[in-house]
Amino acid sequence: MIKIIDNFLPEEEFKSIQSLMLGWGFNWYYQKGRTYEDDELFLMVHMFFQPEVGPNSKHIDIWNTFMNKVEAKKCERIKANLTFKTPTHEPTLYHSDYSDMKTAIFYITTNNGYTEFENGVRVSCVSNRVCIFDSN
């Protein structure tokens, strides 16, 4: 089941997160491969949290309200992905990051991108929207 919630965070809190992540002082890091390392695509990432190392960003606290609202019982990873505008859509392979848990995708900007699921459902990128689904 795919659950979509628009206007997920209070406007002021969302704008604060958006401003931080789109600002000059926010660090992004190159990652080879969007889905798999050899897929010939790339993206920029910011890792907020990984269980192996714990909080991995000085900005981890911006996600407190978000985690409470999604009622997360355990966090496996908080990661921001930044992809770039391309002349044509660059589809990636379907994949599962984890099994037996839920994934939440939170959209920071509105653009012509989307998240596509194996059943054909497409979720448009709309700022302050969250898409929650079973990871497997």
Question: Positions of the model-derived regions?
Answer:
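Conserved metal-binding segment of the jelly-roll/cupin
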Residues: 123-136
